[in-house]
């Protein structure tokens, strides 16, 4: 992962689980990281441990604010974006037969719509560099 030195990377879902581990590994590689999530205490813990980590609290279910988030996150990273790791997501404990339409829409908005919009607005930033990477992660941990 040496080729990530000084690369500007956004990681969503960084306040727990896989996202937290991704931030730690990227920091070891020398990347500049913008970690986002909903649990500010966990984000602040990451920031206090690593020099290359900046944080922004953001709830990706707020799809109308995603474009502004990408703008703010890119500005925090100095204006350039090399990669976004779309790691944030949710699951419901209900079986499909018991899931309400509201629960279904929330899962779709967070896991699909927000990932699409994060990627869409990140691409606009990456086009300035004429390169970039988008990594989408889905899992149930």
Regions found by a protein language model. Name each.
Residues 119-120:
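A short, exposed helix-loop element centered on a Lys and neighboring polar residues
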Residues 15-16:
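Conserved glycine-rich cofactor-binding loop
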Residues 139:
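Residue(s) in the substrate-gating loop at a strand-loop-helix junction
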Residues 95-96, 103-108:
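Substrate-binding pocket helix/loop in short-chain dehydrogenase/reductase
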Residues 87-92:
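Conserved NAD(P)H cofactor-binding loop of Rossmann-fold oxidoreductase domains
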Residues 58-69, 101:
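The beta1-alpha1 cofactor-binding region of Rossmann-like NAD(H)/NADP(H)-dependent oxidoreductases
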Residues 29-44:
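Conserved glycine-rich Rossmann-like NAD(P)H-binding loop of the short-chain dehydrogenase/reductase
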């Amino acid at each position: 992962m040496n080729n990530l030195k000084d690369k500007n990377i956004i990681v969503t879902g960084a306040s727990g689980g896989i996202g937290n581990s991704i931030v730690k590994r990227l920091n070891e590689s020398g990347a500049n990281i913008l970690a986002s999530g909903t649990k500010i205490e966990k984000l602040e813990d990451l920031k206090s441990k690593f020099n290359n980590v900046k944080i922004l609290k953001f709830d990706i279910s707020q799809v109308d604010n995603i474009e502004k988030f990408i703008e703010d996150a890119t500005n925090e990273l100095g204006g350039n974006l090399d990669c976004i790791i779309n790691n944030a997501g949710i699951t419901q404990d209900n079986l499909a037969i018991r899931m309400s339409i509201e629960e279904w829409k929330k899962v779709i908005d967070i896991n699909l719509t927000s990932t699409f919009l994060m990627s869409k607005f990140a691409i606009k930033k990456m086009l300035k560099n004429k390169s970039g990477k988008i990594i989408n992660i889905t899992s149930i941990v």
